[in-house]
Structures are given as structure tokens and as C-alpha cells.
Amino acid sequence: MSGLADWETPALSNALRRAGVTQSYTDGSIQRISGGSFLGTAVTATMRAREPGEDGVPVADLHRAVLAVEGPVVVVIEDVDEVPGAGAFLGEVNGTLLDALGISGFVTNGRVRDEPDLRGMGFAVHAAGLCVARAHMRLTAVGLPVRVGGLSVTPGDLLHGDQHGVLRIPPETASRLPALAEEIRAEEQAIVAWARSSDFTPAGLLELKRVRH
């Protein structure tokens, strides 16, 4: 899977489209807050924060799930409140603990806090934004399918993320994607090079057989 890490999510999205694969990725409701690109296996959980309540599961269950996965891990937490974002799971303390476990990414449809601290950690953070408080935050489940910002995630899914968003990589097509991405990039760069050259003409552009790019 190492070849996938060399590509940005738009290139891999193009490759998935050429492979005829239905895609699942985050929409504009989730943005990268900190960190760089990542490629890792999903560990999932759900949380609530808006109203008081008992913990459904201890945070240690999430840590155990992270430790059970070989290789880089992406923690994906769905805020299941009717209106997400009342409080944050991820901040300095929980972030430091997950950083110590070596995760590569964190994705949530909720909000996070302690942004300056998060920027110093070794994993990327994608969230709906920032908030002030922890509020009544508690985890309600670990290890079940979740949906964050339009992206459906099952535990064990392979996720690729960068400044554009987070994309699920189907395992049956993962090995084919780098070659397809390279093929598409060569086609696109030929068009870009022509557009920047002295050979470019408006008439030639109108004759170019392109459906979309």
C-alpha cells in the first residue's frame, strides 16, 4: 500500500473512477485542522456531548482497538448528537494519548479544541471545526460502522486523507490505483503542457475530445 501514500486524494479519486468503483469521501462539512497526509486503517467510535449522560464505553476501549491494529491507524469518531459539535473529544490530553499510540489520522463530524497543541502532534486532524468546551462528551460505542461528513466507514477500512479531504480506498482495487493514477496524470499533463505551449490555439481547444477533467 506504500505507493498510495505518494498520491493526493484527487488523483486517487480519478483512479477509482476509471476503475469503475463507487466512491465514498468527506464533503465540505469537514476540513483539515492540522497535520499532513495520511494512509491508515480505520478504528471507529461514536460520541455525544450535548446533554449529560453516563459513558457508554470507557476511552480505554478505543485505545485497545487502536492497539489491536497493525500499522498506521486512523481514528474516526461520529458525533451522533442531533446537532453535532457541542463539545470536543479531541484536545490536548486525548490527542497526546493518541499521539503516544502512534495514530496517523483523526476524523470526526464533530469539533475539536486546543488547536495549537494539535498542530504539534504527529497525526492529521479533520473535523467540522473548533469549539471551546468538552461539554458532556462521552464515547457511546467503539468498533461499529459510522458516517462522518458523507463518508461511510467500517472498522478496518483503508482511508487516505490530505488537504482535500478523506477518501475510502476499497481493498480490492488498492493495488491497481497507483498505475491508474499515473496513467491519468500523464494524460492530464500532456494537456497542460500543450495549453502552455506555442502550439496552443483556441480552435484546437474546441476540437479537443474531452468529456471532463
Question: Which residues does each predicted region cover?
Answer:
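C-terminal binding/interaction regions
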Residues: 159
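Feature captures the catalytic cores and cofactor-binding loops of soluble hydro-lyases/lyases
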Residues: 1-155, 169-213
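Short amphipathic alpha-helical "interface-anchor" segments enriched in bulky aromatics
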Residues: 162
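Channel- or pocket-lining gating/hinge segments that regulate access to a cavity or pore
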Residues: 165-167
